[in-house]
Amino acid sequence: GLVKVNGKVIKSNYKVKLNDKIVVTEKEVVEADIKPENLNLDIYYEDEDVAVVYKPKGMVVHPSPGHYSGTLVNGLMYQIKDLSGINGEIRPGIVHRIDKDTSGLLMVAKNDVAHRHLVEQLMSKTVKRKYTALVHGNIPHDYGTIDAPIGRNKNDRQSMAVVDDGKEAVTHFNVLEHFKDYTLIECQLETGRTHQIRVHMKYIGYPLVGDPKYGPKKTLDIDGQALHAGIIGFEHPVTHEYIEKHATLPNDFEKLLDDIRRRDA
């Protein structure tokens, strides 16, 4: 509703006509005062250019309206301090993101040169990003690739979906363990679209356990989707050495698997 033509809010596909009166209202930008906070983040690797940090489940990556404290950025500002500035004041050091209720590892850039190199690696699809996920249903094959474009859900702008005019999205997966009603899988991202694994697994009929947005109603004792970014691998932006870090499953995910194994026994 920020653009009006002849006093009326118009749709994005409106074609401007001669003598139309166009009024654009500038959105008020609130400069948030983002403060460093001691959140005791686990840092898996750090040197003068890059860091690999663990984001626990339930933590937002960067500040946004209503979330100005307790974010990964607040913790990074306290523990790392030197962070790249390319993404602005509310996203220092942030090269890529994972969802609030997904746990796991993220690359962090400590200067702009490192930031650009890491982004280039993401764009050229050379960063290794592997996730562990628990899905509903029993996947009959041992591995597969989902190549389906993702964009905004036309019926619900707050969620994503596989859509014809979406951006390229490719997810590779392989089965780690079969259960009676569930399958434990490892997913490797070739692209990094919003909610990619969650949308793709729903698309092929195996939605993530606990997913409040794309899954069925809650049936197991876990808050949020059972998804963990356990492996990150990339080339160091300065030394060009290969760095790969692994993070074990969080306790709630491990407990969930143990409960299912006991139930199936």
Predicted features, each with a name:
Residues 1-265:
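RNA pseudouridine synthases
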